[in-house]
């Protein structure tokens, strides 16, 4: 794909020949349509497929932007010198070293229906036990919470690195002019980390649209398939039901969804950038 994009925009013949451009684009469209065309059965009318698409987008949106916004807040709060803040940053960074299976098993014990650490704490304070992973909204919350806890380390480090590149003189000049903390955040801090904010957003969207183990191990895709994701559906089609064509088709759909959100973020952040460069960045 990268080679095709490069040839399309660098080759002088393709650049000036409308007919060849049309043929080139048509060939790429045919390639993708062959990929998303199911070979075993027409699952486009399958409610499970569309429910998996919706679940994937919901989980990815809340977990990706939950990570991004929480990470920037923690980065600002811990961007200070001292042993205490170094330890705190290390603790957040260390969460990424946990394997996803181990993470899922730990959170399954924390939020298991009725007999779990969280429910034991609720009962100790006089509340009834709650089946967290057996309800739609709370099951999604557990998956999002586990994913945010697991992936927040790298964004914090990236935001801290960006914050340390902002000159202190800007803050000093703003204080002299009487700027409040909120004004300094909106007009100095946020513009200073805007490029890292885009990078973190794109990386998190790409990663969280591929959620699998958390959904598989924490909720099993339930209840009523309301936490089943596209990657989970690919796994079930390909390796459980041996419907390799359907699994491959869903994987192409997932690729297109990731491409749509990634290119949208890149293009919104820099609308003057040629769109083909955004395509190349996405492919890389």
Residue locations for each model-derived region?
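A structural signal for multi-pass alpha-helical bundles of membrane permease subunits
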Residues: 1-269, 273
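Positively charged, low-complexity/disordered segments
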Residues: 270-272, 277-284
């Amino acid at each position: 794909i990268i080679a095709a994009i490069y040839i399309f925009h660098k080759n002088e013949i393709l650049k000036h020949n409308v007919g060849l451009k049309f043929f080139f684009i048509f060939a790429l469209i045919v390639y993708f349509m062959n990929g998303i065309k199911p070979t075993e059965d027409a699952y486009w009318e399958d409610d499970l497929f569309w429910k998996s698409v919706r679940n994937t987008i919901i989980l990815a949106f809340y977990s990706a932007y939950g990570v991004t916004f929480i990470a920037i807040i923690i980065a600002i709060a811990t961007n200070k010198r001292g042993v205490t803040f170094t330890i705190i940053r290390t603790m957040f960074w260390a969460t990424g070293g946990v394997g996803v299976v181990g993470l899922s098993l730990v959170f399954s014990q924390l939020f298991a229906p009725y007999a779990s650490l969280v429910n034991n704490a609720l009962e100790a304070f006089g509340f009834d036990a709650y089946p967290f992973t057996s309800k739609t909204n709370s099951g999604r919350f557990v998956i999002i919470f586990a994913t945010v806890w697991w992936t927040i380390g790298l964004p914090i480090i990236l935001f801290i690195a960006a914050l340390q590149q902002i000159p202190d003189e800007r803050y000093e000049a703003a204080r002299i002019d009487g700027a409040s903390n909120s004004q300094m955040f909106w007009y100095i801090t946020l513009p200073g980390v805007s490029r890292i904010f885009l990078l973190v957003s794109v990386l998190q969207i790409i990663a969280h649209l591929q959620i699998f183990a958390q959904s598989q191990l924490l909720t099993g895709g339930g209840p009523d398939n309301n936490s089943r994701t596209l990657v989970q559906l690919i796994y079930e089609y390909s390796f459980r039901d041996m419907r390799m064509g359907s699994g491959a088709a869903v994987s192409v759909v997932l690729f297109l969804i990731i491409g749509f959100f990634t290119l949208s973020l890149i293009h919104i952040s820099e609308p003057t950038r040629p769109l083909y460069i955004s395509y190349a960045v996405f492919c890389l």
